[in-house]
């Protein structure tokens, strides 16, 4: 593992780190698994239960919440946000919700996919192998392998035959 000289890197003991992982400053990692040869930029949070495959790049200001799996060779651009709750609420009956009131909905990003900067991925979807998500897209449903999508909501622009 290689840590930059930048201050404040919070890496909890529960994190499983692979070989040759590069982590830059102002990161917050806990309860996640990080594969070999991964680069994690500044101001990134990766929550418990998330899995990052080998040779992935997670660019700065990205939020990877519980339930997200990135397979090998995935690129995540700057300021990408994943979600894991279909109906987020602080309260439903006037009482602050607890973790018991919440169910994590997982998201899978398959091998070689690329997520453009500023994209938001809603939970419960699969991004297919080698798919490309355009910058600023809001992805609300599955993206087929090899497809390029963009927009809000994201729509298929091209598909590999």
Each language-model region and where it sits:
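Flexible, glycine/small-residue-enriched loop-and-beta-strand segment within the central core
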Residues: 2-13, 25-125, 152-153, 160-161
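C-terminal/domain-terminus segments
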Residues: 125-142, 146-148
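Conserved switch/coupling elements of ABC/ABC-like ATPase nucleotide-binding domains
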Residues: 138, 153-156
């Amino acid at each position: 593992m290689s840590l930059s000289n930048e201050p404040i890197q919070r890496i909890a003991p529960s994190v499983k780190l692979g070989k040759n992982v590069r982590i830059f400053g102002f990161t917050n990692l806990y309860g996640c698994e990080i594969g070999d040869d991964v680069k994690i930029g500044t101001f990134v949070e990766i929550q418990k239960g998330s899995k990052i495959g080998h040779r992935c790049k997670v660019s700065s200001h990205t939020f990877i919440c519980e339930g997200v799996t990135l397979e090998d060779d995935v690129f995540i651009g700057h300021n990408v946000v994943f979600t894991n709750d279909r109906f987020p609420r602080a309260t439903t009956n006037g009482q602050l919700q607890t973790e018991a009131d919440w169910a994590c909905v997982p998201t899978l990003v398959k091998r070689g996919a690329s997520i453009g900067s500023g994209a938001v991925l809603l939970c419960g979807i699969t991004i297919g192998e080698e798919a490309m998500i355009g910058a600023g897209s809001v992805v609300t449903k599955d993206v087929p392998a090899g497809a390029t999508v963009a927009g809000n909501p994201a729509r298929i622009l091209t598909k590999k035959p």
